[in-house]
Structures are given as C-alpha cells and as structure tokens.
Amino acid sequence: MLRQTTKRAFLGLASQNPTPFPVVSRLYHPNVIDHYDNPRNVGSFDKNDPNVGTGLVGAPQCGDVMKLQVKFDGSGQIIDAKFKTFGCGSAIAASSVATEWVKGKSVEEVLTIKNSQIAKHLSLPPVKLHCSMLAEDAIKAAIKNYKEKQDKANGETVETIDSTYLHGIGS
C-alpha cells in the first residue's frame, strides 16, 4: 500500500512538473549563468610579451585552476584581459567578471578589486566564495608578473609586491 501511495504521489508530482527535480539554473544567480553561458575574454596572450602579466592560481580543495592575463599599453593602463579556467561554473563566472572589471584600469585601481565585490556581484553562496578569492588572487598574480617583467626590462632590481599589502587589499 505504501508503494502504491508513493507511486501515485510521484506520478501526481510528475504530471504537475515534468521534471520533479529542480533545474540547476535555479540554484545560480542570473549573473553566474550569464557569465558561464557567455564567458567574456576567454583565451590567452603570449606570456613572453613584456606588456602581458600572467597569473596562475589554484584551489586544492576543489581542483579549480585559473589563469588570468592582463595586457598593458605604454602608459600603464590595462587594455585587454584574457582567462582560461578549469573549474566549476562559479569559477568560470568569477574569471569572466574579473577580466571585464580590470579593463581600462591602472595597476593601482586593479589592486583595489576585492573578492567580496566579485562574490556580491555574482551572489555566490559561502561554499563558492573560494571562486571569487581565486579571481582576486589571479589578478594580483598577473600584476606581480607584469611588474617583475617591467623591472627586469628596465634593468632594475626585481621588486616584488609586498604580500602583506596584497592580502590587506583582499580583506
């Protein structure tokens, strides 16, 4: 009898909703879906270009890997950005948003982008916050790489960005 009642209840549910399980897109904010379905700036630049900074970061807890590259003009403004991400939809969306937000900005402006801003824009749940942290870390790593290339090209001692300063920005 329990089996018949369960079967009737399930069939009744199925007749009201052809898919008794929630559609995955209902679990994500529209901004995540938009950037996942239509990611901006996918690709890469030549990492040996002195005007390109490359940041490669990963999250061991989930296996996400993010490569973000920024291309500068002669005056220190970011003119383009590209990414390649191996990871979940939230990581791809965070990468896409990051590349959009860095364009047209200077190094100083870019270093003010915080993971909390990306997370808020995408309405990421707590379990996905590491995706926005990866995006922020990738931006910082790309800027660090670019500065190291510029210092080396100018014959200067390679100056690294103070990690305390970088972590303070991301807080």
Swiss-Prot record:
Keywords: 2Fe-2S, Iron, Iron-sulfur, Metal-binding, Mitochondrion, Transit peptide. The keyword Transport does not apply. NCBIfam families: iscU. This is Iron-sulfur cluster assembly protein 3. It comes from Arabidopsis thaliana (Mouse-ear cress). One of its GO terms (biological process) is iron-sulfur cluster assembly. The lineage of its organism: Eukaryota, Viridiplantae, Streptophyta, Embryophyta, Tracheophyta. One of its GO terms (molecular function) is structural molecule activity. Component of the core Fe-S cluster (ISC) assembly machinery.
